[in-house]
A protein has these predicted regions:
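Soluble extramembrane regions of membrane proteins in the secretory/endomembrane system
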Residues: 31-162
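Post-cleavage N-terminal segment of exported redox proteins
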Residues: 1-48
Length: 162
């Protein structure tokens, strides 16, 4: 079993492997999710794309991808910021719509009204409001309110006021 052409097979494997890596690298950037601006229904900018990109740099700098849950095992490695943010958004949206119904007295809400508000919040959170042509997401009034409260919450939390 004397083979003098082993290098041809090695070269073929290296070319195929390198081609795969190059293809995956290209696909990663080509198929990356959009980074839109987030605006209120009245057109006020809530979150700009540049702010999302700055946040992404902080996320990477402090390796925050190492925190939170993975495979449903809970927040064993640290706080799950995504779950916390989503929960706070839902709570703030419920609060916003509840105050609209009762003129700021949430104790007046009946269970049926609370259930209706909860359904509305779930529907709004699941709706895709992305406009690909303008690269924007138009938030609902409740989402815009919750986004502002979320910024206040995390600003306070990370500055030590919370």
């Amino acid at each position: 079993m004397k083979s003098t052409n082993w290098w041809k097979y090695l070269l073929a494997v290296l070319v195929v492997g390198a081609s795969g890596v190059i293809f995956m690298g290209f696909s990663t950037y080509k198929d990356a999710p959009p980074k839109p601006d987030y605006i209120s229904p009245s057109g006020v900018e809530i979150v700009q794309r540049a702010a999302v990109e700055r946040g992404q740099l902080v996320f990477q700098k402090y390796a925050l991808m190492e925190y939170g849950s993975m495979f449903g095992d809970g927040a064993a490695r640290g706080p799950d910021f995504t779950a916390e943010a989503l929960h706070r958004i839902a709570v703030e949206m419920n609060d916003y719509y509840g105050r609209q119904v009762t003129n700021n007295n949430l104790d007046e809400l009946s269970q049926i009204e609370k259930d209706g508000i909860s359904i509305r919040v779930k529907r709004e959170l699941k709706a895709n409001r992305y406009d690909g042509e303008r690269n924007i997401v138009v938030l609902t009034e409740g989402q815009a309110y919750a986004a502002e409260r979320l910024v206040e919450y995390y600003s306070s939390k990370f500055k030590g006021d919370h």
